């Protein structure tokens, strides 16, 4: 009965959209973020911060924080949210693993940090925005942001901005200011793009 409930045209369309968004996100993170060392806010940035401050492996901290965020998302958004998030998260991992099998399109993009920051924001913003629009979260911080936005009625891009600014500000304890500024540009732009796509009709 549960399978029959979800196997509808609307559900299949949503799954295709989730996979598309996850593919775009994975492409951007592999070909731009990884090659340029642009850092992030949210859970990813916080795991790097905890590794620097407390020597806690991101493998452990990300698992714990994502589990907490998804639990909050489940309690706030319901079971459909968890199903969609599971699909988008698995699709992201799959697509990223595929992209890793090929050389980066522009391996020297790190030499052009401004280009990397803007391009990275576009791929992250569009990829996550598409997933959020149909009700899925590719990672824990998206789940937390969506939950906070639903409860507080504050637009999603401003929740992203506040959380990312907080993490990036704390990251100044171990990352040079110049690199943080480029990362700030990325998270501000991507957050605005996510918010625009998520509410666009």
Sequence positions of predicted segments:
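Core subunits and conserved enzymes of cellular information-processing
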Residues: 2-201
């Amino acid at each position: 009965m549960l399978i029959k409930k979800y196997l509808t045209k609307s559900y299949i369309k949503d799954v295709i959209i989730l996979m598309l968004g996850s593919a775009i996100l994975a492409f951007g993170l592999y070909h731009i973020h990884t090659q340029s060392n642009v850092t992030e806010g949210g859970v990813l940035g916080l795991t790097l911060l905890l590794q620097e401050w407390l020597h806690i492996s991101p493998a452990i901290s990300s698992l714990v924080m994502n589990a907490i965020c998804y639990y909050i998302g489940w309690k706030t958004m319901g079971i459909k949210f968890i199903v969609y998030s599971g699909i988008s998260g698995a699709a992201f991992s799959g697509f990223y693993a595929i992209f890793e099998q090929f050389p980066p399109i522009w391996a020297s993009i790190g030499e052009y940090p401004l280009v990397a920051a803007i391009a990275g924001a576009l791929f992250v913003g569009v990829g996550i925005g598409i997933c959020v629009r149909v009700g899925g979260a590719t990672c824990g911080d998206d789940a937390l942001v969506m939950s906070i936005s639903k409860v507080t009625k504050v637009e999603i891009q401003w929740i992203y901005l506040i959380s990312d600014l907080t993490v990036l500000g704390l990251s100044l304890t171990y990352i040079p200011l110049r690199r943080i500024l480029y990362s700030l540009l990325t998270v501000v732009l991507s957050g605005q793009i996510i918010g625009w796509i998520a509410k666009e009709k």
